[in-house]
Curated annotation (Swiss-Prot):
Annotated Acidic residues bias: 780-792, 891-962
Gene3D superfamilies in the record: Leucine-rich Repeat Variant
Underlying gene: Pelp1
Keywords for this protein: Acetylation, Activator, Cytoplasm, Nucleus, Phosphoprotein, Repeat, Repressor, Transcription, Ubl conjugation
PTM notes: Transiently sumoylated, preferentially conjugated to SUMO2 or SUMO3. Sumoylation causes nucleolar exclusion of PELP1 and promotes the recruitment of MDN1 to pre-60S particles. Desumoylation by SUMO isopeptidase SENP3 is needed to release both PELP1 and MDN1 from pre-ribosomes.
Protein name (Swiss-Prot/TrEMBL): Proline-, glutamic acid- and leucine-rich protein 1
Motif annotated as LXXLL motif 7, chain positions: 271-275
Species this protein is from: Mus musculus
Motif (LXXLL motif 9): 460-464
Positions occupied by motif LXXLL motif 5: 177-181
Tissue note: Widely expressed with high levels in testis, ovary, uterus and pituitary gland.
Ranges of compositional bias, category Pro residues: 646-657, 803-829, 840-865, 973-987
Domain note: The Glu-rich region mediates histones interaction. The Leu-Xaa-Xaa-Leu-Leu (LXXLL) motifs are required for the association with nuclear receptor ESR1.
InterPro entries reported for this sequence: ARM-like, ARM-type_fold, PELP1_middle, RIX1_N
């Protein structure tokens, strides 16, 4: 066609030079090219009488192609400009010439449409009135409908451009528009749609000038409201909705706002009247309109064959559309919407159900019309929500009840159809879900959808029903329907056998006629509405609802990806798959506070969703992955994080002052040179706690004896959010060791502790910690330390604690377990020659897992705080909840310790009551005084003789300090300087131990307690007496700071919450390497030797730490073994 345009220009154009060889060289210039094209179009349409050669293509044959040529010309840009005025002038003359002839009017209108859109302002103002007169002449002529349609389209563009120019606006309004409307009103019936298009343009761009003909226009519009042509009816409704804005500010004595409200009330009154006529004697309690509106006088149908109910329904539909358009269209002045009256009409329509209709007479016809009336009411409700927005919130309860009511009314017969068939009433249900999405989109979480109540449960049930794919089912049926399987009374006959139902459900899907995309519209609408509701109201929705959605969505996504439900399900449609992924993302972004989101499963689903055939679905999955990645791995740390991240290793700075509502800031410890990087075990669990260090990839190395961070607990992890740690519990010179793997030294300052070279701690072997984690939070969650010296060590993590990190490298006993009220003890002075070692960076705090049930005799004392100076405390630890170490394989020893604790409880009771109030004051006063010191110890391995001498010396010094306390040493042993009263013994049930010969289960919980002001005295230590026969079975638990988990536990046989007295000296006990069990036994043999001197101390302090119920039989105290 382009070649024909160019050839026509060179053949017939007077200015043929541009078409020659010289003109083609200038095609690169934009204005020159447009001028060439304009002249080519002119040449095609000009007569060829003067040409010596007969034209190959007569002009009349270009008429069908002329609209396409105009569109092609517009692709090259605007034709306006000073350089094209001559060509445009030629086109104007050509257009006027063609409009004057009946045979060439269509070509003239095509050129006029190009001139109106492309001419500059000056040219448009000069020729606009003449063009309007030409169009009016075309409308008055009885031309073909196609010419009339093109003339109205050109008129719409001309009025739109003329309304922007004040001079033309006044001229056309005063002199031309009334005549133009009269011409449109007089068009033939077959041109009514074109006439309505022209009237709509007039009332839209020149509403004031149409006021004089408002009455005639209203009658014309009303007469077309019940038209059977949907396009004609829609145009009539759009025009009628603009009637209140016609005329001046006081149209017929009424303001525009008053006119709008009066028209609205008239529509409401007429709709109530039509509804009464449609369903007379079927409504249980008909509601009459009480508004000020006057019923419209609608003309009766001239067709006597049309049923009156069908005519009434068509009028009702037209008036309802007019009401909705008045609500949704823009109006030039603020108006008052009678919300209550509109809602009354909507409720009256939706209140009519099939149960109220009598099926005799015209009842079936009324039942046939009812769904369409409900659809009109739902459209009206949607327009009302759009018009009023969140101001409808006070009617939110009514709207929340209406939606499930409509779904219940149109849910019959939906479960009896085979897959591949469209379920009945899907259009109504789709509209209900669209209104649900709109209502939540407008009002947000205030909409109150799915937030409990009978209506919320009913709505959720319908949503899940429409989202779930259909399933094939076979059912047995009896041939005669008898309950006895065919054995009926009367004449004897052969027994009848049950047969399968021979319905369509029996046929396999491949042999069944059906629609592969059946019910996809209602499914996609339900998914959109549910996704929007979860996204906006997710945290307010019940936990059970979230779990139900998880149980449905996750398997459904997997089935869709594996192609298991794509036979005749709605998920063959890409819209439904997109809605399913959108719902899954909403469940991630707005989870319930009590139901963790399925993050791991969703990440896998989105990853697989990127391979979808549909580009829209795969693009959404890619965007969802980016969103999830931004949530799980933010590129920058958040401003207020619940737990500290792991920055680059750095020395331990002094701790910050604690806050009352959050844990102290995280202080990154130093580098970790001894242990290699910890391998990662896989993605995060979906619903369980965050994996600990053992299951996360580490960028650095873990040292053999790292110090805990400022807010670390005995697991080497920082305290969970909103837990304030007193300063005495933070690492300092008085309550922190550099090694963190040895016991605290309770000797006076000046006694250097023994040291152990880092390479000898593990016998030159680099340990690699490993953990086994469960992905779900269950009551039986355990962490198994695979690197410990014995394979039977299992650590149960109770509620409120994060998972266990790698344990310290030195095999020292665990911190003592408190059983009484918080006890304070003076801090241990720092060693002069102690050497600071870099500490390990702590991992972020994981969420606390639930408490697992103990499988042995468990005695849980009340949650207490542990004193910092107790043996095995390993320096200060962060606050945790019940510190209790339980060995389920030594029930006899537990009974002995309980008896001893009960004996000493009475001795210490009086003194505890006197110092109860002092402890509370000192607890807060000592917070700022005891965070300035830090102890660091190193042990040397292989020098057992040196250790014996140092143990004796340090134990002597501790004994002098403990027995030298003024007036506080009682017969049973020295109590701490300030002791609050012990709690009464709690009768905790004992569980019978399991018949497990080897594995020992340790329930380890820790809650550090307050300390006294720093001083030369140290807290008396409490340790149970350990029989010599139990020495070799003793399990050494590393001190709580950090380190690999292989040194945490060995064969746990220690009594609950008590430690051996021999380890009191801190660095006196050397952990043997895993390769030398003989040295380990020798080291353990020397542990109970110093207990002979400290037996009385142990007895004195038992009641202050553990309250256990007394037992009937009390075995004699065990004798101390000789070293």
């Amino acid at each position: 066609m382009a070649a024909a345009v160019l050839s026509g220009a060179s053949a017939g154009s007077p200015a043929g030079a541009p078409g020659g060889p010289g003109g083609l060289s200038a095609v690169g210039s934009g204005p020159r090219l447009r001028l060439l094209l304009l002249e080519s179009i002119s040449g095609l349409l000009q007569p060829r009488t003067a040409s010596p050669v007969a034209p190959v293509h007569p002009p009349i044959q270009w008429a069908p192609h002329l609209p396409g040529l105009m569109c092609l010309l517009r692709l090259h840009g605007t034709a306006g400009g000073a350089q094209n005025l001559s060509a445009l002038g030629a086109l104007v003359n050509l257009s006027n010439a063609h409009l004057g002839s009946i045979k060439t009017r269509f070509e003239g209108l095509c050129l006029l449409s190009l001139l109106i859109g492309e001419s500059p302002t000056e040219l448009f103002q000069q020729h606009c009135v003449s063009w309007l007169r030409s169009i009016q002449q075309v409308l008055q002529s009885q031309d073909s409908p196609s010419t009339m349609e093109l003339a109205v389209a050109v008129l719409r563009d001309l009025l739109r451009h003329a309304s922007q120019l004040p001079t033309l606006f006044r001229d056309i309004s005063t002199n031309h528009l009334p005549g133009l409307l009269t011409s449109l009103l007089g068009l033939r019936p077959e041109c009514e749609q074109s006439a309505l298009e022209g009237m709509k343009a007039c009332v839209t761009y020149f509403p004031r000038a149409c006021g004089s003909l408002k009455g005639k226009l209203a009658s014309f519009f009303l007469s077309r409201l019940d038209s059977l042509n949907p396009q004609l009816q829609q145009l009539a409704c759009e025009c009628y909705s603009r009637l209140p804005s016609l005329g001046a500010g006081f149209s017929q004595g009424l303001k525009h706002t008053e006119n709008w409200e009066q028209e609205l009330h008239s529509l409401l009154t007429s709709l109530h009247s039509l509804l009464g006529s449609l369903f007379e004697e079927t409504e249980p309690a008909p509601v009459q309109s009480e508004g000020p509106g006057i019923e419209m006088l609608l003309s009766h149908s001239e067709d006597g064959n049309t049923h009156v109910l069908l005519q009434l329904r068509q009028r009702f539909s037209g008036l309802a559309r007019c009401l909705g358009l008045m609500l949704s269209s823009e109006f030039g002045a603020p108006v008052s919407v009678p919300v209550q009256e509109i809602l009354d009409l909507i409720c009256r329509i939706l209140g009519i159900s099939s149960k109220n209709i009598n099926l005799l007479g015209d009842g079936p016809l009324r039942l046939l019309l009812l769904p369409s009336l409900h659809l009109e009411a739902l459209d009206l409700l949607s327009a009302l929500i759009l018009a009023c927005g969140s101001r409808l919130l006070r009617f939110g309860a009514l709207i929340s009840r209406l939606l499930p009511q409509v779904l219940n009314a149109w849910s019959t017969g939906r479960d009896t159809l085979a897959p591949g068939q469209e379920r009945p009433y899907s259009t109504i249900r789709t509209k209900v879900y669209a209104i649900l999405e709109l209502w939540v989109q407008v009002c947000g979480a205030s909409a109150g959808m799915l937030q409990g109540g009978a209506s919320g449960e009913a709505l959720l049930t319908h949503l899940l029903s429409d989202i779930s794919p259909p399933a094939d089912a076979l059912k047995l049926c009896s041939t005669r329907g008898s309950s006895d399987g065919g054995l009926q009374s009367g004449k004897p006959s052969a027994p009848k056998k049950l047969k399968l139902d021979m319905g369509e459900a029996l046929a396999p899907p491949s042999q069944r006629k059906g629609d592969r995309n059946a019910n996809s519209d209602v499914c996609a609408a339900a998914l959109r509405g549910l996704s929007r509701t979860i996204l906006m109201c997710g945290p307010l929705i019940k936990e059970e609802t979230h779990r139900r959605l998880h149980d449905l969505v996750l398997p459904l996504v997997m089935s869709v990806q594996q192609g298991e439900v794509l036979g005749s399900s709605p998920y063959n449609s890409s819209c439904c798959r997109l809605g399913l992924y959108r719902l899954l993302l909403a469940l991630l972004l707005a989870p319930s506070p009590r139901c963790p989101p399925p993050l791991a499963c969703a990440l896998k689903a989105f990853s697989l969703g990127q391979w979808e055939d549909s580009l829209e679905v795969s693009s959404f999955c890619s965007e969802a992955l980016v969103t999830c990645a931004a949530l799980t791995h933010p590129r920058v740390p958040p401003l207020q994080s619940s737990g500290p991240a792991c920055p680059t290793p750095a020395p331990v700075p002094p701790p910050e002052a604690p806050s009352s509502f959050r844990a102290p800031a995280f202080h990154p410890p130093g580098p970790m040179p001894s242990i290699g990087a910890v391998p990662s075990t896989g993605p995060l669990p979906s619903a369980g706690p965050i994996p600990t260090v053992g299951s996360m990839a580490s960028t650095g190395q873990v040292p053999s004896r790292p110090g805990p961070p400022a807010t670390a607990n005995h697991l080497g992890l920082s305290v969970p959010g909103l837990v304030s740690v007193p300063p005495r519990l933070l690492p300092g010179p008085e309550n922190h060791r550099a090694g963190s793997g040895e016991d605290p030294v309770l000797a006076p300052s000046g006694t250097p502790p023994p040291s152990i070279p880092p390479d000898e701690t593990f016998g030159g072997r680099v340990p690699r910690p490993a953990f086994v984690h469960y992905d779900k939070e269950e009551a039986s969650d355990v962490e198994i330390s695979l690197e410990s010296d014995s394979d039977d060590s299992v650590v149960i993590v109770p509620e409120g604690l994060p998972s266990l990190p790698p344990a310290p490298p030195s095999g020292t006993p665990p911190p003592a377990a408190p059983a009484g009220p918080p006890t304070a003890s003076p801090p241990v002075p720092a060693k002069e020659d102690s050497e600071e070692l870099p500490a390990t960076p702590g991992p972020p705090p994981p969420p606390p897992p639930p408490p697992p049930p103990a499988s042995g005799p468990v005695t849980l004392p009340p949650p207490q705080l542990v004193p910092e100076g107790t043996p095995g405390g390993g320096g200060p630890t962060a606050m945790e909840e019940d510190l209790t170490v339980i060995n389920i394989n030594s029930s006899d020893e537990e009974e002995e310790e309980e008896e001893e604790e009960e004996e000493e409880d009475e001795d210490e009771e009086e003194e505890d009551f006197e110092e109860e109030e002092e402890d509370e004051e000192e607890y807060f006063e000592e917070e700022e005084e005891e965070e300035e010191f830090e102890e660091e110890f190193e042990e040397e391995e292989g020098e057992l003789e040196e250790e014996e001498e140092e143990e004796e010396e340090e134990l002597d010094e501790v004994e002098d300090v403990e027995f030298g306390s003024a007036g506080e040493v009682e017969e049973g042993g020295p109590p701490p300087p300030t002791l609050p009263p012990a709690l009464p013994p709690s009768d905790s049930p004992k569980v019978q131990p399991e018949a497990e010969p080897e594995p020992g289960l340790l329930l380890e919980v820790e809650e550090p307690g307050p300390e006294e002001v720093p001083g030369p005295e140290t807290a008396p230590t409490l340790a149970p007496e350990v029989l010599p026969s139990q020495e070799e079975g003793e399990q050494e638990v590393g001190s709580p700071a950090a380190g690999p988990p292989q040194e945490l536990v060995e064969e746990s046989s220690a009594p609950p919450a008590l430690l051996e007295e021999g380890t009191e000296g801190g660095g006196d006990k050397v952990p043997p390497p895993p390769e030398t069990p003989a040295e380990e036994m020798e080291t353990e043999a020397e542990v109970p030797a110093p207990q002979e001197k400290e037996q009385d101390d142990t007895a004195a302090m038992l009641a202050d730490f553990i309250d256990c119920p007394p037992d009937d039989e009390k075995p004699p105290p065990a004798t101390e073994p000789d070293s």
